[in-house]
């Protein structure tokens, strides 16, 4: 029984508390549901997958006349893909490969499997398979620490954190922030196992710097009343990338979502603590997104300064810039696209932020052009391109500038999610493609010689991607003026040939109208 407790994460049977609370006999009263089903807050498509991994909830639902999910009980074979018992045909989608990248493998089947392991729920399966015990409890109430390889993900119980003597400076991820005895638990520490995981020690790639001083304590932190503060709620520790850049910040959110899968818990009754060793605050232009993951404000670590803090349950989340991680440092096999993970992430965030689809519209294709008010990568003949689009009666054209002071992030998401063709210059704003509808296309008007960034992100999300194809028909204002590197294509502005632009947009429209999820199956000769 004790071993089952220790390896609960690995066996995928012990979720974080807060989501799945057993009902009492008093709850069995007639007219009252046996479970708080509204607390799940999951898209309808995700419910059978949740029930597959939470059979106790499925059992309650089967006996409960108030359960709204009875129709999903017939689909309990459905699984995300990382579960040991998951048959491939029941996975939450599978990648599609159009050709074999011989630099990686030699068959379509192996290419599909490789892509699934690189960037889909197969990535979660590999992390789950790596988890081992670093600090072993002697009894169920003792502390514990289990981690994946390189300490990219860890889960602790009875965690002791002593912040009475720490020293802060300008460094957000100070590696010697904690000393021996200032972090630990009452459990049997395998110090060799801990030290052996330091090969990828780096601020946004590993938790090794924070946990290398984990100490086997000679007292039980909570039972022996050694804590100034006891945090009862499950707590996620996160080291965050740049909060002012959507591409980088959504690496944080995607990895938090993946961590929830590893924990088999999607509860929002949790705390999120930003691990930051500096005295600074954190500028966050996308803070509304946290509402998809927690009911509370994000807590800065310095909130606990000068205190001994104990956490009953703590998770050290997967990180945004892990080597071979998701999605900043992801090496991807070519020729494959469409991960269930990124589609599920998109659905999850949109559902919890209450962003709804108001279309598509019969006889219309909704085209959104993302303008830039920054100094570089402006579309110099934007008005000319917009006027050309408006000559096509099928197109419903909108020009937006996603400036956070003028348009809140939730309003930005509503526009993006209700777009069929999304057009923009190379830049972090194209990360919005994550929240386009499945049938949509994204047109990176010019990639500024950074060919893979948004092409790969579109492949991960499963969104059709096009970009400018004829160098002779794009006209830079000059050769670019990088502040230190000199000439650089990202540091200038561009004009575009109107005829070539329209040709590419019409190609994108044809994809939208022919997509299997486009509901209006008519001829579109007007294009």
Swiss-Prot record:
Motif position, Prevents secretion from ER: 524-527
Glycosyltransferase in keyword set: yes
EC nos: 2.4.1.255
GO cellular component: endoplasmic reticulum lumen
Gene Ontology BP, a term: protein O-linked glycosylation
Keyword terms of this UniProt record: Endoplasmic reticulum, Glycoprotein, Glycosyltransferase, Signal, Transferase
Keyword Glycoprotein recorded: yes
Entry comment describing in which tissues the protein is expressed: Widely expressed. Expressed in brain, heart, kidney, lung, skeletal muscles and thymus. Highest expression is observed in lung and the lowest in skeletal muscles.
Glycosylation sites: 354
Stored InterPro entries: Glyco_transf_61_cat, Glycosyltransferase_61
Position of the signal peptide: 1-19
Subcellular location: Endoplasmic reticulum lumen
Main subcellular location of this protein, as a coarse class: endoplasmic reticulum
GO molecular function: protein O-acetylglucosaminyltransferase activity
Entry function: Catalyzes the transfer of a single N-acetylglucosamine from UDP-GlcNAc to a serine or threonine residue in extracellular proteins resulting in their modification with a beta-linked N-acetylglucosamine (O-GlcNAc). Specifically glycosylates the Thr residue located between the fifth and sixth conserved cysteines of folded EGF-like domains.
PANTHER family in UniProt: EGF DOMAIN-SPECIFIC O-LINKED N-ACETYLGLUCOSAMINE TRANSFERASE (PTHR20961:SF148), GLYCOSYLTRANSFERASE (PTHR20961)
Listed name of the protein: EGF domain-specific O-linked N-acetylglucosamine transferase
Native species: Mus musculus (Mouse)
Source lineage: Eukaryota, Metazoa, Chordata, Craniata, Vertebrata
Name of the coding gene: Eogt
